């Protein structure tokens, strides 16, 4: 059984509605590199290819390691009162962590310095600190889903609960290259850098 078939018990075509295409987040994602050989610009992996590959591995883990049961138990234990819409949004938040985790690699300094990407002339953005990408990825994720939550028909209590899940996921995205320490420091850094998502 495929990941989409397991998810909410609906067929694959409907599940794809919950996955946000990277093209809806980043204009011309084919211009951005995710990885290259030792930062020398050779053999670049395009960001879209990287996201697709990561998602494929997530599907494999979901199927073979029974992630669905883990997340169902997590949701039932921490937020048993969520409506059907709230549950769908909860799972959309989870699935799309994979899609958003490296979106911050659109940082012009990351592209020019780390990736040696010469596909376009990159213009540095002053409020971005060096070549960092993880906190920017978290800000883009937060910005996208905050709007979705606010536009939803969820009750105020459900929105508050979903906001907590969203913030935890943004924290995980921001730390996906390191350890998960310093949540308070993340909140401070995130509040200072939330303006980044508005730029993009």
Task: Briefly describe each language-model feature range.
Residues 3, 7-11, 18, 23-200:
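Accessory nucleic-acid engagement/destabilization modules that flank
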């Amino acid at each position: 059984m495929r990941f989409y078939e397991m998810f909410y018990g609906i067929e694959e075509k409907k599940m794809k509605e919950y996955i946000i295409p990277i093209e809806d987040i980043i204009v011309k994602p084919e211009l951005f590199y995710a990885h290259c050989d030792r930062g020398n610009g050779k053999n670049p992996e395009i960001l879209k290819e990287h996201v697709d590959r990561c998602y494929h591995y997530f599907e494999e883990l979901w199927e073979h390691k029974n992630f669905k049961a883990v997340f169902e138990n997590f949701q039932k234990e921490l937020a048993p009162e969520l409506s059907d819409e709230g549950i769908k949004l909860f799972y959309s938040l989870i699935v799309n962590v994979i899609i958003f985790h490296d979106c911050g690699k659109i940082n012009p300094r990351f592209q020019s310095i780390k990736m040696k990407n010469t596909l376009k002339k990159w213009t540095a953005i002053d409020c971005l600190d060096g070549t960092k990408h993880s906190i920017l990825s978290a800000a883009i994720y937060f910005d996208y889903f905050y709007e979705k939550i606010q536009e939803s028909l969820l009750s105020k209590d459900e929105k508050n609960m979903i906001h907590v899940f969203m913030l935890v996921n943004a924290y995980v995205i921001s730390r996906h290259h390191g350890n998960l320490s310093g949540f308070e420091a993340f909140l401070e850094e995130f509040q200072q850098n939330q303006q980044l998502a508005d730029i993009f």
